[in-house]
Amino acid sequence: MKRATRQRLILLLVVVALLVLAGWQLRRDAQGEPGTLLALDPHSISHITLTLSGSPTMHYEKRDGHWWRTDGTPERAIDGRLAELADTAAARVLSWRPASDFDPAKIGLAPPQAILTLDGQPLEFGESSVTGPQHFVRVGQRIALVSLHYTPRSPALKTTELH
């Protein structure tokens, strides 16, 4: 075997080994991904309940592709705002910890600042984290850290978009 052929073969083996290692690392990283808050598709959610601290509970239901507030006389809600709340189900979790690792009062979960219930699955929102723009969210017996972007706001309030 010529020297040039042997060098190309060694180079090819090194490239194949690097590709195998990169594939293994990507698969390992994907398995370690914390996932989302809930295993619900935001588009399939049909019932939302929102309780903000100091406010009465608001109930919403999706009918014929539009959101309706069902407290008292049913009235149309702002679809975009309710879609934002439904999107919270798919919020990317930065990290999960057992609820037993925290004192609920110290992270704003005794009582929670907001309770968002999506198709019967409650999400309890606490204080912002001191480590960055994140919120503590209790989901069952676990606490998640999620972006502040997913902090529930009242869908009844109109907002102005800045351009």
What do the PLM-derived regions correspond to, one by one?
Residues M1-H163:
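A short-motif feature that recognizes glycine-rich, charge-decorated loops
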